[in-house]
Amino acid sequence: MKHLNKLVRAWGRILAGSYPTLSLEITRECPLRCPGCYAYELEHLKEAGPLRSLADYQGQELVDRVLALVRRLRPVFVSIVGGEPLVRFRELDVLLPQLSRMGINVQLVTSAVRALPASWSAIPGLTLVVSIDGLQPEHDRRRAPATYERILKNIHGHRLNVHCTVTRQMILKEGS
């Protein structure tokens, strides 16, 4: 029943003019250089207008601009992506609790190359999503440098979702 009430409230907000989802690229920086990552394609957000400019800000200015955009568009759900969003760890440590207090459900998509703060587990409405490219051999072949073991260490103790890009090589692999 709790989930149904939440769904009804979300639909009410959408019908009243709120955006269902807002995806924010808060940085293009990333310590990895994974093949196929859109973050390094110069034109990947050419049509997005003001959203692309968020990646140009840091510190309190980034926090203020994200909050202003969220207040203006009133989304039900915010997805925070990058590059690697954890590059802006300090800003996220301020931003995530504020978005939660505003009643915004947030999805943070990360490679988990940095340890996830334990305190984030207590933030209501926050879903951590970790990008993994298959099991260890496949993942480490695609990532530069190999990160599978590091991810396991960095996500330990967290409840999260996994985002996996399925490639042609995975599908065609013998025994799949």
Describe the role of every protein-language-model region:
Residues 154-174:
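Conserved strand-turn element in the central/C-terminal portion of the radical SAM core barrel
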Residues 143-158:
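Glycine-rich S-adenosyl-L-methionine
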Residues 59-63, 92, 148-151, 173-175:
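Aromatic/hydrophobic pocket-lining residues that form the small-molecule binding cavity
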Residues 2-119:
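Conserved alpha-helical substructure of the radical SAM core
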Residues 44, 85-87, 112-117, 129-145, ...:
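Conserved radical SAM core fold
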Residues 123-128:
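Glycine-enriched alpha-helix->loop->beta-strand junction motifs that scaffold or abut catalytic
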